[in-house]
A protein has these predicted regions:
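Hydrophobic helical membrane-anchoring modules
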Residues: 1-3, 179-250
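Cell-envelope/extracellular polymer assembly enzymes that use nucleotide-activated donors
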Residues: 5-7, 35, 191
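Short, well-formed alpha-helical segments that are part of the catalytic scaffolds
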Residues: 14-29
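Acidic helix N-cap motif at the loop->helix transition within catalytic regions
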Residues: 17-21, 45-54
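Short beta-strand/loop segment that forms part of the nucleotide-sugar
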Residues: 33-43, 65-66
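A conserved acidic beta->alpha catalytic loop
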Residues: 40-49, 99
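Acceptor/aglycone-binding surface of glycosyltransferases and processive sugar-polymer synthases
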Residues: 67-86, 91, 103-186, 222-227
Length: 250
C-alpha cells in the first residue's frame, strides 16, 4: 500500500532566534515520506537565511517560499498550502514555527491521518488527566470564549479551532477553499473550516463525519508569541462577520 506523502506548511515571521533547526530536520524523517514548506512572511531578521540553509540541508524535502513583504499568517499559510497542492502531497497540514506541538505529536497526527479516511484532522488542546497541556490561565479562558464563538459561527461542534496543528486530505473542497485569499487575518482557521463545510456550488462539502479533533498529549506555550491582546477583539469581530456570512448564505 502506498503511504501518503505529507507536506507541512510552516509560516515564519522573524523566527531566527526561535526556529529549532534540529527538530525540523527530524520532522522530515519522522513523517517520511514528507516535506516541509517554510513560508517567510517578509521577515526583517535572519529568518530567510536560516530557512534557505535548512533547505540546502534537505534538498527535495524542505522548500522555502519567500514573500516580498509581510502579508500576515493567513496569507502565508494559504500560499504554502497552494505550493503543497502543486506537489505530490496527499495530505497537507500546517503548524506553528515555535513547535508548541512537538514533533512526536505531529508524527502521531500524521499516522492517524494516514490510517484513516478523515479529510480534516485537528489537533486539540484539551487538558485531561495524563496529558501535558501547558497554557497560561488567561490564554486558556480567552481561548475558550473564542472557541465557543467559533463553534457557534460554524455550526460545528468544534472544541479548538486555533491550535496550530492541522492536517487536510487533498480534496476538491480543499483546493476550492484556498482559491481566494482569506477575508480574516485573525480567524482564518475558522474561515477555512467554514469554506470546507460550505464550498462553492458544484464542489462536494467535507462531511462532519470526516472531520476529527484529536486531543494532544503534549502542548506548551512557547515564549515570544507575536499575538497581540487586540487580536482577540479583532478575531471576535471577524467571527461575527463570518457567522453573518454563513447565515445569510455564501
Amino acid at each position: 500500500m502506498t503511504i501518503a506523502h505529507v507536506a507541512w506548511v510552516v509560516p515564519c515571521f522573524d523566527e531566527a532566534t526561535r526556529l529549532d533547526r534540529a527538530a525540523f530536520l527530524a520532522l522530515t524523517e519522522g513523517c517520511a515520506p514528507a516535506s516541509v514548506i517554510f513560508v517567510d512572511d517578509g521577515s526583517r531578521d535572519g529568518t530567510l537565511a536560516l530557512l534557505n540553509d535548512l533547505a540546502q540541508a534537505r534538498p527535495g524535502q524542505i522548500e522555502v517560499v519567500a514573500l516580498a513583504k509581510n502579508q500576515g499568517k493567513a496569507e502565508a499559510v494559504r500560499q504554502g498550502m497552494l505550493r503543497a497542492l502543486a506537489g505530490p502531497a496527499g495530505i497537507i497540514g500546517y503548524l506553528d514555527a515555535d513547535l508548541a506541538t512537538p514533533p512526536a505529536e505531529l508524527q502521531r497526527l500524521v499516522e492517524l491521518a494516514r490510517s484513516s479516511d478523515l479529510d480534516v484532522l485537528l489537533g486539540s488542546r484539551v487538558q485531561l488527566l495524563g496529558r501535558a497541556i501547558q497554557r497560561s490561565s488567561a490564554r486558556h479562558y480567552v481561548g475558550r470564549v473564542f472557541a465557543t464563538c467559533a463553534s457557534l459561527s460554524l455550526g460545528l461542534p468544534v472544541y479548538d479551532t486555533q491550535c496550530g496543528a492541522k492536517l487536510f486530505r487533498r480534496t476538491q473542497a480543499l483546493a476550492a477553499a484556498l482559491a481566494e485569499p482569506f477575508t480574516s487575518r485573525w480567524a482564518f482557521d475558522v474561515e477555512l473550516l467554514g469554506r470546507l463545510a460550505h464550498p462553492p456550488s458544484g464542489v462536494d462539502p467535507i462531511a462532519v463525519a470526516r472531520m476529527h479533533e484529536e486531543p494532544l498529549r503534549i502542548w506548551s506555550d512557547v515564549p515570544g508569541s507575536k499575538l497581540h491582546p487586540l487580536a482577540a477583539v479583532r478575531g471576535g469581530l471577524d467571527l461575527l462577520r463570518l457567522a453573518l456570512k454563513t447565515r445569510l448564505g455564501r
